Structure formats: C-alpha cells, structure tokens
Amino acid sequence: MRGAYSVITALLVVASSQIAAESDYQLQVYHHDVTVAGNAVVKSLPKRYLRGSQHVHDSNEERSVYSVLASMINEGVSKMPQAAEAVEKMPQAAEAVKKMPHAATAGKKVSRVTRTGKKMTSHGANARKGPLRADFVEKMPHAAEAKEEMQRANQHDLLKAIHQADEALEKSWHPSSDTAAIRYASHGISSNVILTLKEWRKNFRGMREMAVSSEHKDIIKPIHKAFVRLCGENMDPTTIEMSHIWNMMDWNVAASPATSHRQNLVSQAQRYVLIGLRSMKKDPAVWKEWNKLSKSLRFGVLDYLLNLHYQRWVRMYNIFKRHRPDKWDVPMNDKLSLDGNTDTNSALALQTHSNKQSLYPNEPSNAAWTSKGDRFVSSKRSRRTFNGNTDTASLPSKRSKVRSSKSFVPLSTESTTFGDHSVSTKTSRVSAVAPPKRPKAHNLDVLASAATALALKDSEFVMHES
C-alpha cells in the first residue's frame, strides 16, 4: 500500500509542478513520508523549473522527462471513468458468478435445441421424398400467378433497358453537319434523326435482292465514279446503291416525297441489319456467343446498327440529290471532274439526259431548235414515259454546225431577227442538257440539241446542214 501511495504522491507533485511552471512560480520543497523510489522521482523537482530556460542546467532533459510523465497522466485520466465504472460493476460481477450454475443449465438446453434441429432436418428430407400434401397442392395455382408476375416484371425490365439504351444512344450520337438536310426539308432528309425499335414494326419490305436498274447499266460507270468522289472517304457507295437512289429521284410521289423516301431508306437500313444477322448465323460459334447476350443488349446492338446503316443511306441520298451527277456532265466541284475530258462528258450528258427529265421540272423542255435552210424551226420531240413520268427523250434528226470566233451569250427577253424571220426567246436557267459553262467551238456540234435558246452576238455565222 505504501508503494502505491508513493506513486500517487509523485504524480500529484508532477501535476502541481506543471501549474506552478506555467505561472512562473518556483516550487517549494515538500517533505513527505515516502519510500526511496518516490523520493528518487521527485528529488530534482524543487531545484529547477520544469519549463527551464537555456540558463538552467539539464533543462532540456527535464522537459523530456516531463513530457513522458504528462502523456502517462493524460492516458490515466482518460481511463479513470472506465475504471470507476468497473469498480461500480464489481457487485454485479459477483452476482453473475453466483448465477453461473444457471448458465451451465442453459448450455445444456442449447445442446438439446441443436439435436432437435437435426431431427427436424431429417424429417423435412423424408417429407420431400414422400407424396405432396393436399394443402400444398391447393397452393399450386398461386405459383402459376407468381410465374405470370415474373414474366411481366421481365418485360418491364426489358422495356426499361431498351429505353435506357435509346437514351444512351441519343446522348452519344452526333450527326454530321456536312450531310444534313439542305436548307429546307423538301431538299433533303435530315440526318439528325435517331431510329428506335418501333421502326422495326413497320414499313419493312422484305429481303428482295437489289440490282442495277436496266436503264442505268450502260451509263452508270462514269456517273458512279463521280458519285464516289462526291461522297468522299469511308462511305464507298456501290453501283447498286446509287442506282437505287437514282430511281428514287424519279418516283411519282408528289404528295409527300420526303416521307416516302425516308421510309424507303429505313427499310434499306433494316435490310442491311438482317443481312448481317444472317451472315452471323452461318458461323455456329459466333451465333452461340450472340445468343448468350441478354435480350436488352441484343436489342441495343441491333438498334445501334440500324442507325448506322440509316445514317449512311441518308448521307448518300442527300449528296446525290444535292449534286445530281446524273444531270451534269461534271460535278459542281471542279476537283471532282471526270478526268477533265469535256468532250466525252458532254456526249455522256446528252445520252443520259435523253432518258431523264429536266433539272427544273417546272420548265419542260419539249422542243428543240434545229436548223433548216437559213432559219430556225421549232420542232416537237417525241415523248416517252420513264417510271410514270412524261419526259422528253428523242434527239433532233439534224445537227447544226456553227463556226464562230465569238462565244455564245444567253438572251434576255427580247426578239432576235434572223433574216426575214424573228424568233421570240425567253431567258431561262440552264437546262439539264446544257452544262453550266460556256461551250467551246470544237464541241458545238454536240451541244446543238440544248433546250436553252442561244443567240449569236455577231453576224459572222454560217449555218450548214449536216
């Protein structure tokens, strides 16, 4: 007991020395009836400040010792409430010790419950082996109802997953501004459209094989070459695709051409997706991996592919409709000309336009100017039907040879006199059969059938019959 008392006394002295040091008050010497160990702990405290300065000998050493003691005191103080609670609970612990026999009996009861549980498990296994009870059979219809509810839940989850896939695709899709609709909706199909799974339920026309139209076989190669250059890289339109778009331009769908064309492009995109699935099915290993995917994921992949194919078709359609390589001998962009051969291109344009309608359908070109003697005579051309559209088709029977050192200049609305005969002409835009540039003298015989009336600025022209 004396040893414990000496330790407590030493701790109290250290605590009081901290208070005194903070107030710069020197500690007094206290003589206590303590043991040698206690005196050894507090022997040096009365002789120096705990927070000694540089002039005090061994002050740093004293501060280091004090820091250790202070940490010990703080730790002990923090544990004092717990110690007090432990002392208060000592009687309860004694009572718990007295009740230990009851704990032993409780342990025996636990063992009995364990043995009972094992018996119940064995009875349950035997019950499964036996016939079903009547009350259990009566509850079977509820299992069928639960199965129906599960199916509804699966359908709901599938629809939710599809909706989320549509939203994700909408956020990640950025259509190209270069191939968007041209000014007005009637001039192109918007590429800023995302198709959903609802598009699979309508307007699909089956897997009919596509081929180049018979009207295009003889003239499609140079036009396709120009169209490929117009489309640029990574699109690679085929002759079959271009022929299909070319035919769409001549459909008799005046009521809603944009809607009809869009539905056809959607159908072509669906066709390409199904062709891809059919190719996948030919490989058993790939088809097996495909079927392992969840339905929502498969629908998402198909929807994504549908949009990719549709965007490609829309861009090809808009480019073809914007530039119409079938109407002009060369594309509007000089860099995309067909090898620079204007003679060949002009002849090709005449051959092409003999079977096609004018670039401006509101201005029919049903008459051609031919030379007869020393005057111009307006002769009606024969008319043909191309996919339901009446169009000019035949070339004039005679060609006019014109020699001049001057260029042709289009007429304004006026009367032009040739000898004794006057011909009234109108200013019009360049028709489909005339290229949008000034013709040269060496290919005037090819351009004689142009529908636009041209005037000779000077009088130095000699007209000869071929």
Swiss-Prot record:
Organism field: Plasmopara viticola (Downy mildew of grapevine)
Protein family according to the UniProt entry: Belongs to the RxLR effector family.
Keyword Signal in annotation: yes
Residues annotated as signal peptide: 1-21
Domain characteristics, as noted in the entry: The RxLR-dEER motif acts to carry the protein into the host cell cytoplasm through binding to cell surface phosphatidylinositol-3-phosphate.
Compositionally biased spans, kind Polar residues: 385-395
Annotated Gene Ontology cellular component terms: extracellular region; host cell nucleus
The name this protein goes by in its record: Secreted RxLR effector protein 101
Sequence ranges of Basic residues compositional bias: 109-121
Subcellular location: Secreted; Host nucleus
Region annotated Disordered, chain positions: 99-127, 384-405
Major location (coarse): secreted
Motif (RxLR-dEER): 48-63
Keywords: Host nucleus, Secreted, Signal, Virulence
The organism's place on the tree of life at top rank: Eukaryota
